[in-house]
Amino acid sequence: MFSFEKNSLKNTDKEIFDAIELEVKRQHEHVELIASENYASPAVMEAQGSQLTNKYAEGYHGKRYYGGCEFVDIAEKLAIERAQQLFGVDYANVQPHSGSQANAAVYNAVLKPGDTVLGMDLGAGGHLTHGSKVNFSGKIYNSIQYGLDENGDIDYEQVAQLAKEHKPKMIIAGFSAFSGIINWQKFREIADSVDAVLMADIAHVAGLVAAGVYPNPFPYVYVATTTTHKTLRGPRGGLILCNNNPELAKKFQSAIFPGIQGGPLMHVIAAKAVAFKEALEPSFVDYQKQVLKNAKAMEKVLKQRGINIISGGTSNHLLLLDITNTGFSGKEAEAALGRANITVNKNSIPNDPRSPFVTSGLRIGSPAITTRGFKEKECELVANLLADVVFNCGDEKVENETAAKVLDLCDKLPVYK
């Protein structure tokens, strides 16, 4: 028998307790600019930390291989219904443990090993699971990669040419570091021309799509995958969506279970349901609109400070910065900004001469700081502070002065009250 007091984390494992406390402190004291990160609400975290973690529930709601699933069934059913409502679709699978798992399931459902897949090149802003040679998607399947044109937009002419030449079975429209807007209709026209399945990976923009401030990939795509954190502000997890295609939906269902997963994480699914409910509130639309405004505010200042932005700017929540002209690498800038209490990630830029472990760029985004309550004024300040550090990496005085300003800003707008 457990006692919530006697068997608390603090009493049971002081090392892990202290590590968590330090991370809580870091989140409070640092400005979070990593585009793929966000802050989950107390309600989401409460659901994820619940006793639902104890329940095994192989199968799907109403069709389990274990007894005692009547209450976790409620959680999964709510998560599915809310996801369907949020994205306007008739099928949602809430069981994928991650976005990569969701993508792997789609591959398994519609392709055979060796089939050709056309996706965005990692160096141009794509994701590992879009055909990178170091990933399963580039090892099991014949991966062909497209990139950006001279204006920093997706090179649709190249996509069409590669599709015509290689006849892919599936085309992936999506990204990990692209600040533009995807033309779903154009992708569908190209996919139809070679009879390919069109998949959208909306992991980065799912919240924007749900709020109606970024184009919805439906009805143009056969299937969409996403993570449930990032702009959706839920727990870390994955999601598969499709509409008006029961045959494909059946394949996705079996591709997850028993295809690549066993027991679902019911505590995470409950947390997803909570996040979807929050995203259905009118305030979520206001939040996503502010995400876009804040990204634009940072864009304006960074351009004024002489930092080059790939694609010329941003039309979503993220900015990919080319910092070559600063004389410092992405690795150096990431470390310097970290010392100044600004968290970013180094990122390759198109045709980057440096390795992915060093890079010539930084990727930043506005979702987390917007959740924190930052508006345009604060984002302009943050962009100026970022520029101060990036042009002076290693300058202890600049880094310390910046850290002090960041701490003051963070104290005024805490993540959790």
From Swiss-Prot:
EC code: 2.1.2.1
Annotated site residue numbers, Plays an important role in substrate specificity: H229
Functional pathway: One-carbon metabolism; tetrahydrofolate interconversion; Amino-acid biosynthesis; glycine biosynthesis; glycine from L-serine: step 1/1
One of the Pfam families matching this protein, by short name: SHMT
Binding-site positions, (6S)-5,6,7,8-tetrahydrofolate: L122, G126, H127, L128, S355, P356, F357
InterPro entries registered for this protein in UniProt: PyrdxlP-dep_Trfase (IPR015424), PyrdxlP-dep_Trfase_major (IPR015421), PyrdxlP-dep_Trfase_small (IPR015422), Ser_HO-MeTrfase (IPR001085), Ser_HO-MeTrfase-like (IPR049943), Ser_HO-MeTrfase_PLP_BS (IPR019798), SHMT-like_dom (IPR039429)
Catalysed reactions, as listed in the record: (6R)-5,10-methylene-5,6,7,8-tetrahydrofolate + glycine + H2O = (6S)-5,6,7,8-tetrahydrofolate + L-serine
Enzyme category, top tier: transferase
PROSITE patterns in UniProt: SHMT
Keywords: Amino-acid biosynthesis, Cytoplasm, One-carbon metabolism, Pyridoxal phosphate, Transferase
Xref: SUPFAM superfamilies: PLP-dependent transferases
Sites of N6-(pyridoxal phosphate)lysine modification: K230
Disulfide bonds: none
GO cellular component: cytosol
Cofactor: pyridoxal 5'-phosphate
Highest taxon in the source lineage: Bacteria
Gene Ontology MF annotations: glycine hydroxymethyltransferase activity; pyridoxal phosphate binding
A biological process from GO: tetrahydrofolate interconversion
Main location group: cytoplasm
Primary role: Catalyzes the reversible interconversion of serine and glycine with tetrahydrofolate (THF) serving as the one-carbon carrier. This reaction serves as the major source of one-carbon groups required for the biosynthesis of purines, thymidylate, methionine, and other important biomolecules. Also exhibits THF-independent aldolase activity toward beta-hydroxyamino acids, producing glycine and aldehydes, via a retro-aldol mechanism.
Subunit structure: Homodimer.
UniProt name for this protein: Serine hydroxymethyltransferase
Lineage, highest ranks first: Bacteria, Pseudomonadati, Pseudomonadota, Gammaproteobacteria, Thiotrichales
